[in-house]
């Protein structure tokens, strides 16, 4: 019986992954990355398609998964398609407690968000911005988010 347990333990030990390597040390660009993501959110909140397109790469995508008040599942569209739906000044999205990672000219922001429409919580989830720096300017390539209509803060 003990030999069987030792054999099982040996097999499970051999399938473990090696420890993850730590990310490079912070470069000091985290605030610039966060400023870019916040500028994009500000453009969403004012419903300004021109300003949104200023902070993104046109070839990027907006992809959502989960539940919204009107639909569920995976949704994906270009930034141009996304901006065509802007204009509702009652829409307000906020993020909190962002995690920012930077490696050279690539970065990401991961943060919980809450969307309010007319001051009432509509949905919440997590945003994942992936950003690229070109000519010293951080722009969002893609925004991917989860969404739910229950268990949201202040709901």
Regions of interest found by a model, annotated:
Residues 1-13:
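Sec-dependent N-terminal signal peptides of Gram-negative exported proteins
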């Amino acid at each position: 019986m003990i030999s069987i347990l030792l054999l099982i333990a040996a097999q499970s030990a051999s399938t473990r992954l090696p420890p993850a390597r730590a990310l490079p040390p912070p470069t000091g660009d985290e605030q610039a990355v966060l400023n870019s993501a916040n500028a994009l959110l500000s453009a969403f909140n004012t419903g300004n398609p021109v300003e949104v397109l200023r902070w993104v790469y046109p070839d990027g995508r907006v992809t959502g998964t989960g539940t919204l008040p009107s639909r569920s599942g995976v949704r994906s569209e270009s930034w141009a398609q996304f901006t065509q739906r802007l204009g509702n000044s009652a829409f307000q999205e906020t993020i909190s407690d962002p995690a920012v990672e930077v490696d050279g000219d690539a970065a990401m922001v991961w943060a919980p968000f809450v969307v309010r429409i007319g001051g009432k919580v509509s949905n919440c989830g997590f945003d994942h911005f992936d950003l690229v720096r070109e000519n010293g300017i951080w722009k969002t390539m893609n925004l991917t988010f989860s969404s739910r209509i229950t268990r949201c803060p202040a709901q």
